[in-house]
Amino acid sequence: MTEKKYIVALDQGTTSSRAVVMDHDANIISVSQREFEQIYPKPGWVEHDPMEIWATQSSTLVEVLAKADISSDQIAAIGITNQRETTILWEKETGKPIYNAIVWQCRRTAEICEHLKRDGLEDYIRSNTGLVIDPYFSGTKVKWILDHVEGSRERARRGELLFGTVDTWLIWKMTQGRVHVTDYTNASRTMLFNIHTLDWDDKMLEVLDIPREMLPEVRRSSEVYGQTNIGGKGGTRIPISGIAGDQQAALFGQLCVKEGMAKNTYGTGCFMLMNTGEKAVKSENGLLTTIACGPTGEVNYALEGAVFMAGASIQWLRDEMKLINDAYDSEYFATKVQNTNGVYVVPAFTGLGAPYWDPYARGAIFGLTRGVNANHIIRATLESIAYQTRDVLEAMQADSGIRLHALRVDGGAVANNFLMQFQSDILGTRVERPEVREVTALGAAYLAGLAVGFWQNLDELQEKAVIEREFRPGIETTERNYRYAGWKKAVKRAMAWEEHDE
């Protein structure tokens, strides 16, 4: 028997599908990535082709093994992490989708959400699903497809159609339709799942008229769900044994498995999650209550805050404003000036996320005087990412009563030392940047490996979580509070911009 030396993580993201091979020391052996098409049928609508998601993801699995010259019988297990909330409906018999995947960013169900609000469901939804009413989550997307594809609701009732988030779709394809499952973290993003009873919520299914027959079975984030024999030489059957939504996988990959530990992922947007242990903390400050993974993949809870514009605002400097040629240049120009010269940039291009949830806010630059140049605006744009992170952290500390000792960070923008130092300055808290930046894939790999005994427990992994650099606050409290007060003033003035005067 060949020694099982590796774990594969499949990381199905919003713009690309990736596969990562790791060894027992959590070193990355090889990576394969394929992008796929973003479909925008109307303004504010976003779709993916589920068959293309599957094609790109399955080919990266074959590629990543070939690249490292590894045969499939050396793989101990496969873990899956995925873009959350994105919704797919398909035929049980043929495996064919009945509609494109409706992506988490898609706003087409805003009207359904308005109806839910008018029907007075906000409190029920917040208390039972942990979420706010927003087109972001899967529930209204499922309803939209059932409303718009003729005969689909009846077919679903007869058990002919299946619903899944991306993890469910991939596993169904990888097991040739034998396994229809999701995990607690992904289920907690559907607005159809009761995070206290850990079961699908009958009232939500009734309100949205979604037949229970089409829903996947919900399982722990770390257990064997089924086997696949796709990819690589040898065609051995490999257990699929870990699933978590991307942000929860990153939280686990950063080993934030104890109450009060938090991470912030700086991608297109920012996602901050704080583990709250075995208690679901109901937010009074505009955050989401969601399910995370405990030390063995069991159910823990987390508070989550989403900032819509982080890396995206640096892309705006590059693509629309033409102030920089490359995202990496932003650090160089930001450090050419001592401060922002009184300027604040509020990047509310698509409204504001947590903790404001104002879809009518718009982007603005405040505090312009004659001495302001391009470098000040670049610096202020970077600083806005750190200010928004503080907004979310303040809400988290208020909700949980926990004072954060250190923030673990990951994602593309953490390579920017200026941003990380300013983040520490404005939070008044240590910021820890890990050696391995692929924490989302790491989380999926850890969950899969723990389930099959590849790793015995998380203690084995603690020593692998090397912090590459720690940033410590370098400004006084009065200065910190003065700057943050300016930010709050700027945000207030950017809010409700789009609301039309009667």
Swiss-Prot record:
Key enzyme in the regulation of glycerol uptake and metabolism. Catalyzes the phosphorylation of glycerol to yield sn-glycerol 3-phosphate. GO terms for cellular component: cytosol. It comes from Escherichia coli O8 (strain IAI1). It holds the Pfam family FGGY_C. The lineage of its organism: Bacteria, Pseudomonadati, Pseudomonadota, Gammaproteobacteria, Enterobacterales. Belongs to the FGGY kinase family. Its EC number is 2.7.1.30. Homotetramer and homodimer (in equilibrium). Heterodimer with EIIA-Glc. Binds 1 zinc ion per glycerol kinase EIIA-Glc dimer. The zinc ion is important for dimerization. The keyword Flavoprotein does not apply. Keywords: Allosteric enzyme, ATP-binding, Glycerol metabolism, Kinase, Metal-binding, Nucleotide-binding, Transferase, Zinc. This is Glycerol kinase.
